[in-house]
Amino acid sequence: MDKASALTALRAHQAELKQLGVEHLFLFGSTARGVARDDSDVDFFFDHPLGSIGLLELIDVKAATSRVFGHPVDVMTRRSLHPILREAIESSAVQVF
């Protein structure tokens, strides 16, 4: 999926994702860079209110974004980004909402 299509699809589901606790959603990785292949997964990280997300809520966000694309996604919170990779990921990320 190309970057523009991914952004459009995600923005169409903004209300649903916000109900799941997603305050801000960011696209990163090959889709954000415009180099995704047909077999590429789609990578996201998101911000949420502190203390409001647990494993089950994270699974719900992953399931919701996976339904948007119909194939695998990687979803994580901003706080869970690896410290060594965080700066590179954040600098290349595209804010969805």
Language-model-detected regions and their locations in the chain:
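Short hydrophobic/aromatic beta-strand micro-patches
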Residues: 28, 45-47
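Catalytic core of pol beta-like nucleotidyltransferases
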Residues: 1-24, 33-38, 50-97
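A short, structured beta-strand/loop element
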Residues: 38-39, 44
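General secondary-structure edge motif
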Residues: 44-45, 69
